[in-house]
């Protein structure tokens, strides 16, 4: 797998501020920015012939192993022979955010998603595994920050989310995407037949893409119902209770078998899989 990275290095929030409400605000905005960028990358994946298989964005408080710098990072798993086009796409999407920011509706969706994650963590606070606490304490010891507990964090995040406008989010992300102090990384297998671009070619592609004109992000919103015409309802033709592990098996009129297994592992969660 060939993975392409662009690191936009930036100064970190000082530790004495990172352990205050300022650190929580910063983390909230970073999660919002990453969520919206990931949504935009997902839109590209649904277009014809995307150059990458997967792409994401995130802010790394530690650039690589450096403790003194953070980095707004965009990364993608490039398709074979599509390294240059992947780099071009990542740069153009980043420049789109740099120039125009995010839309209010994008922010609202991301805000709901982020708060939902914290709500889920809050609801599952009594089912938390030990390793989650260990990771949090280790991160606090090595990187600083805050560990107020999910009860306090959930309460504060709800207050913060109500008072952070999209303009503040846009100002943050546009400050993070600098014009210099940028690192391009490329990793892949040392395999016969695979050709990688030189450092000069990567730089040339990056600079060229950064000069390309980009338009504001345009959302395509459909008012059409998800299912325009509801199908004729089927029926449950057979119900088997007392199955292994407390499951119930329903046989439907179309021949599909549905296995229902209630658990108390998590609250407010339904998992569905099909084969």
Regions found by a protein language model. Give the residues of each.
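Proteolytic maturation boundary segments
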Residues: 1-42, 46-48, 108-112, 119, ...
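A structural supersecondary motif
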Residues: 7, 34-77, 136
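Acidic/histidine-enriched alpha-helical segments
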Residues: 52-56, 96-134, 157, 181-192
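Short, flexible segments with low predicted structural confidence
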Residues: 61-62, 132, 140-145
């Amino acid at each position: 797998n060939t993975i392409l990275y662009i690191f936009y290095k930036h100064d970190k929030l000082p530790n004495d501020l990172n352990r205050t409400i300022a650190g929580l605000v910063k983390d909230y905005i970073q999660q919002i920015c990453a969520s919206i960028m990931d949504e935009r990358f997902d839109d590209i994946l649904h277009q014809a012939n995307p150059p990458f298989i997967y792409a994401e964005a995130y802010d790394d408080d530690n650039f690589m192993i450096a403790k003194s710098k953070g980095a707004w990072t965009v990364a993608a798993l490039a398709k074979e022979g599509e390294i240059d086009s992947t780099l071009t796409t990542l740069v153009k999407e980043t420049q789109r955010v740099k120039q125009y920011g995010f839309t209010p509706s994008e922010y609202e969706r991301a805000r709901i998603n982020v708060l939902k994650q914290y709500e889920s963590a809050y609801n599952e606070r009594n089912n938390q595994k030990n390793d989650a606490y260990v990771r949090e304490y280790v991160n606090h010891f090595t990187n600083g920050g805050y560990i107020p507990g999910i009860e306090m964090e959930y309460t504060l995040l709800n207050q913060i989310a109500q008072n952070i406008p999209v303009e503040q989010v846009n100002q943050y992300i546009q400050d993070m995407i600098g014009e210099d102090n940028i690192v391009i990384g490329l990793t892949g297998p040392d395999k016969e037949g695979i050709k990688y671009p030189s450092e000069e070619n990567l730089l040339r592609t990056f600079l060229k893409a950064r000069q390309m004109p980009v338009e504001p992000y345009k959302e395509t919103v459909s008012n059409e119902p998800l299912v325009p015409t509801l199908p004729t309802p089927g029926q449950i033709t057979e119900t088997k209770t007392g199955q292994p592990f407390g499951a119930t098996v329903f046989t439907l009129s179309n021949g599909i078998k549905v296995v229902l297994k209630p658990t108390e592992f998590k609250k407010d969660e339904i998992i569905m899989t099909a084969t």
